[in-house]
């Protein structure tokens, strides 16, 4: 490990010497880039991630001097991947630069990939507001490139975090927008009932019984097969429980569905919010009597 660090430092010195020395403009930067690349690889082998990351940043700067945007972008991406192991902030900064350079070079799918990586880092940091911003950026790029599946995955993440932040209408709109065109795609249509279930749960969180009923009617029109699914039955039963302010009925409906198809943490969290809202209404009415 120490040997690799020493070798890395030697390559780094050679790179700096090339840049500051005499030589043809193009060739000296190419040689320096080669030395920085070797130095970064040595630091990676030594698991010295910060040094590897900073060396890749130097590599990108040198490459940009020779106007090779694709390679410069890739060097920033490599820096970001090294920094992922030590500093989310530095990783995000480098991946942002990579995405910018790929966009500038017309490599839109690559830019989308790195915006998505940034969003995932913010997700790990529990910074859902920023995660939404970067998943939206990635989704927009994928949509423009007609990469529908990738765009849907990013938009679903936006909806997930929007709902967690109680931005229910935004989440509903996204889930419905994903579900509608997916009905005409043989690969995507089987996921529609899941998107409609998620949208319906968000409707329940808003607590507007009329809106919930209207949404269920709309989902049946959108997908005539939906009314025959367990997801639809769950939403109908939950809507009735909300309307009747019946916590027991609500709990039983959730338990029945969960016994066949386990609810994930996101759905469980939102359904608990609805349940607590019903309980709060019951307490209000008890106080009034």
Curated annotation (Swiss-Prot):
TPR repeats: 112-145
Coiled-coil blocks: none
Gene3D superfamilies assigned to the protein according to its UniProt record, in alphabetical order: Tetratricopeptide repeat domain (1.25.40.10)
Identification of the protein by name: Alpha-soluble NSF attachment protein
Membrane topology note: Peripheral membrane protein
Keywords for the protein's UniProt record, in alphabetical order: ER-Golgi transport, Membrane, Protein transport, TPR repeat, Transport
Top-level taxon: Eukaryota
Any Pfam family matching the protein: SNAP
Gene Ontology biological process: intracellular protein transport; vesicle-mediated transport
Location (main, coarse): membrane
Family, similarity comment: Belongs to the SNAP family.
InterPro entries found in the cross-reference section: NSF_attach, TPR-like_helical_dom_sf, TPR_rpt
Keyword Transport: yes
Location in the cell: Membrane
Protein task: Required for vesicular transport between the endoplasmic reticulum and the Golgi apparatus.
GO cellular component terms, semicolon-separated: membrane
């Amino acid at each position: 490990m120490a040997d690799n660090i020493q070798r890395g430092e030697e390559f780094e010195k050679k790179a700096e010497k090339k840049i500051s020395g005499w030589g043809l403009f193009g060739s000296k930067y190419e040689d320096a880039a080669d030395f920085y690349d070797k130095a970064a690889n040595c630091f990676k082998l030594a698991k010295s991630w910060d040094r590897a990351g900073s060396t890749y940043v130097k590599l990108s700067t040198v490459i940009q001097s020779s106007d090779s945007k694709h390679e410069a972008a890739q060097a920033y991406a490599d820096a970001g991947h090294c920094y992922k192991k030590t500093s989310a902030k530095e990783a995000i900064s480098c991946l942002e630069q990579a995405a910018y350079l790929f966009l500038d070079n017309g490599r839109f799918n690559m830019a989308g990939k790195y915006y998505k990586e940034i969003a995932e880092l913010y997700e790990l940091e529990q910074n859902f507001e920023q995660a939404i911003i970067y998943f939206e950026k990635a989704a927009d790029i994928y949509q423009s490139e007609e990469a529908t599946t990738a765009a849907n995955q990013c938009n679903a993440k936006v909806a997930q975090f929007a709902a967690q932040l109680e931005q229910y209408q935004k989440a509903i709109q996204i889930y419905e927008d994903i579900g509608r065109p997916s009905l005409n795609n043989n690969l995507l249509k089987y996921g529609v009932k899941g998107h409609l279930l998620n949208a319906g749960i968000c409707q329940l969180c808003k607590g507007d019984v009329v809106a919930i009923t209207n949404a269920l009617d709309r989902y049946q029109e959108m997908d005539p097969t939906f009314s025959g699914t367990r997801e639809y039955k769950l939403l109908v039963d939950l809507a009735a429980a909300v309307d009747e302010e019946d916590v027991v009925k609500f709990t039983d409906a959730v338990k029945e569905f969960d016994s066949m198809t386990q609810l994930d943490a996101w759905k469980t969290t939102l359904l608990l919010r609805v349940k607590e809202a019903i309980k709060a209404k019951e307490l209000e009415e008890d106080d009034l009597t």
